[in-house]
């Protein structure tokens, strides 16, 4: 992660935390609730085929959402604290870049740990089981692309901010 002191007056860690939170919100709201492709423990012995299993999954989905709120609140706190001590230099590239790094990191961490190592759920469990890996790999590729794109934006934003202040 980029050090906040080297970001040309912008707290990169705040943007990364916002991105981690938004990545979790996207996963939880879109994939768990709207599309209902999976829930937190659907591949860990709690398929949504009974009211009791559904209740367990909804509770774990809620705990998951609490963690995404925590990331978002931490990002807000870091931004607030930084802005009380320093002048924040806003950039069209720094905040989106940092958020993309965080969102992509969420996908990579969640995709590797929950989908591959623990196997507690997979991205799209509505397709035949032999196709789950393709959705999981696509999720990881999407996350990697966001990290790379976000890193590029961060570097460009830092260069532009330094030039403006020089």
Regions found by a protein language model. Give the residues of each.
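Cytosolic juxtamembrane amphipathic/interface segments immediately preceding
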Residues: 1-6, 53
